[in-house]
Amino acid sequence: LLFISGFAIAGCKQQNQYRPDAKIVAAFNNKYPQADKVEWEQKQGYYVAEFREDGIEHEAWFDGTGKWVMTESNLRYSSLPQAIREQFEKSVYSTWKKDDIDKIERAGMEAVYIIELEKEGLDTDLYYVGNGNLIKTVNEVSKEKRSSYMPVASDIQIWIKQKYPDATIIEMDNEKGKLEVDILDGGKAKELIFQGNDWLSTSWEVS
């Protein structure tokens, strides 16, 4: 029994010491030179570094070539841009309990700030961009939404750039075999629907 316990502990230590290829570590160090308490693991085919910087917990994703893909940061409410805090405090959700606040940065996309809220057993996520615009409200949020944070495929990014040259890609999600991409175009939030790489429709609210 002692031998087995010792082996298990040794195995845990080896797992915590995992490091990817040198080119991936170098890309990470170049992007986050002040990172502290770095731990690596693999998720969904990506190399993921969990670390702390300026007292904030981060998780940075890189592909096999060392290209940065995404970073999720766990923020304090006071760290949100002032424009977001002002809009949130004027909203109907201002009295809800703040469970978590995340900043999602992705290659080729604008940063998104997500305020996770709870009140009387109800869960709601508010998605903002840095200028304070609320771009999405998601109720009864599934906690397994990580894949929707990944960047949009390059072919679709190119199509959007050609069709909406001044737009910013905000968010994406897979629903019933179709890809929903939210963009901000001329200050207006629009939803684009794709099947594979084929565009199907674009919709937006008319005030």
Give short role names for the model-derived ranges:
Residues L1-G6:
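Sec-dependent N-terminal signal peptides
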Residues A8-G11:
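C-terminal motif of bacterial Sec signal peptides marking the signal peptidase cleavage site
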Residues N16-S207:
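Interaction-mediating elements
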